[in-house]
Every structure is written in structure tokens, then in C-alpha cells.
């Protein structure tokens, strides 16, 4: 299809869309403690609402990018932003009514925004064919995954502290509506050269399989309170539906993902690395570090309205600054090499946090947040997203970015479930927070190991893969 919009217009729309998604993912971070109090519930329950959002985002990410290949990516992304706004309104009403159930419903609908970033990267690749320019702009867009210089976290903390947490959701809704208009009128429509019918039966099998596995993981995270009969039943269901999905993909003329692609290291090694990375660090930076900063017994004792200035803001700002540079470095030294250096740096940031968190001063948390922002948000995050694009086959460009987005959201959801469960099982306080951080570090170490299994991109020189 002919391109009539400028790259600047396309970038503007895509940045607004990514920011709208990021608000749903991180704007609530400094407000989680306040939400627990306003809704008269537990930290575990609030953490579960976060898990629900990321689980829904993971499930939608499994198939929406591929659907965009067929019906048009602009049309799909616009619809996603509209539905996200609806979910935000429902979540805001939960704050007005004090209903935790309504919050769960709203957060589930908001999860439709899950594959926003991969869709934007695919649309950007269509608009910017030059690899070097694309790499730099990709770094800018992907860095938004950490927030725009922490403005989202600052606003979230300030709004929650002064107007209640429902005001955070009203703000999200407004930005999502703006994003819908921007995408509709500032970008061009694009599809694959020969659109094919969607494999809806295969999609159903895959969503049920992954959904069952996610619910099982969330149940396991309850540790001694877990219902193990439910866990066993869900694991069996996940296995059965994945086998049905595998058979369907081998029998249908137009599979969602061919068996060959599913079994390649380009797919499973990348997805495993993404899940391990996100599980290891996401809840730490977006929940546990702000919790340490606000703790009055062993932490810095900061208020909800200023905690973001010391943690989430520098974390996001460092990631935003590093993103374009990381994209440039990837083109010179290779995505995989830069990814590994980033993971090592993220491990160092967690090690510093482990040894300094007891009685931690605000400046220590600031240092940790900056280092994690440079290494994870600005480097690892960019490399994992970039690999999802460069490892994708030309005949199915939406499948791997979509599955990778699902892996990002899956890992984020598991992160809140697992790390908060570890923290709770150890009694909270200093020991609980330390146990969660150690668990995260172990998971990051595993991610570093699996990163060596990711292959070079087909048709790419070694330095660019």
C-alpha cells in the first residue's frame, strides 16, 4: 500500500500508542500500596490484579499481531486502543465503588493492549526500510516500555496520593483515546502481501493451553495455600490443548504458526529468555523497589508522591536515554552480544540492591534504579524486542513478535505472582524483600544462560544478529 504519512507523523502516533500501553503497565506501581488501603484488601490481591492484566496481555499477544497481518495493522491497533480505554473506565469505576471484582474486569480488558509494542515495531519497519535508521527509531519506541522519563510513575503517584487511585485510570483512558485517534489519522494501513484466513481453531487451542498454564503458575505461587488438585488439572488441560494446537498446525492449510517455526531455536530460545528475564526483574523494579523505598522500618521511608522521583523516574529516564544507543550498538556488535552484556549489568544492579537494602538511603535506590534502567530497560528490553523482529520469517512477520510480546507479558505477570509470593512466604519485611530479590537474580542468571541458545538471524551477518 502507498505511504503518504511522513516518518515523523508515524513515529508520533506509534510513540503515543506505546505510551498508552505503558501507562497501563507501570503507572500504577507507586499506587499499589494505596490501592490496597482504599479497597480494603491485601497486597497479594492487588498483586493478583496486576497478574490478571499481564496474563490477559500475554494471551491477546499470541494472536493479535498475526490478525493484524491479515486485516490491517492500523485498523487493529486503533481498535486495541479503544478497547483499552473502555477497560480503563471500568477500572476507574472500581475505585469509585470500592469493588475489587470490577477492578479485575477492567484490568482484564486493558490487557488487549498487550501486543502494542510489536505491532508498532512492525508498522515502523514498513514505514522505515533503512536498517540503520530503523534500529535507532526501534530503540526509541522500545525504550517507552520503561515509561517516558518516568512521567507515568510520577503522575501515578501524585494522582493516587491527591485524588485516589481511580484518577490514575481516568488519565489512562484519556491517553488511550488520544492514541486511537493518532494511530488512525497519522499512520498508513499495512498487511502482508497475500493475506490468508486466520486459524481461529488453532488460536483457540493455543490461548486455552497458555491460559491454563498461566492460571496453574499463579496457583502454584500461593505455595502452602495452593490447591494442588486444581494445579494438576490445569497442567493436564494445558498439555492436552497444546497437543491439539500442535496437531491443528500440522493439518490446517493456513496455520497460525507452522510446526517448523515452533520447533526452531529462533522461537523457543528467544521466548524462554524473555520470560526468564521479565520474571526475574519486572516486579522488582516496578513493585519491590518502590516498596523498599516507602518502608519505614528498613527502607528509605519515602512517601508515595515522591518515591517515583528516586526509583521509577531515574529507571525510566536511563532506559529512554540508553535505548537509541543500544539499538545502534546492536547493529555494530550484534543483538545477542549486547543482550548478554545487558543481562550481566542487570544482575550487578540486583547484587548491589541485595547488599545495601537494609537501611538503604534514597541515593542507593537511585543508583540501583539508574543502573537497572541502563542495563535492562535500555538494553535487554530493546535487544529482546529487536530479536523478535529480525528472527521473524518474511512469510509470517507477526508470529514471533506476537509470541515474544506474549512472553514479555507472561513474564511480567509471573513476576508479580512468584516474587510477591516469595516475599509473603518469608513474612514480608526485610527478609521477604531480600528473598524476592535473590529469586529474581537467579532467574536473570538462567536468562543469561538461555540467551546463548538464541541463533543468529537468517540472512543476517554475524554482527547484526
Positions of predicted regions on the chain:
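Central cavity-lining transmembrane alpha-helices of secondary-active solute carriers
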Residues: 51-66, 118-122, 313-325
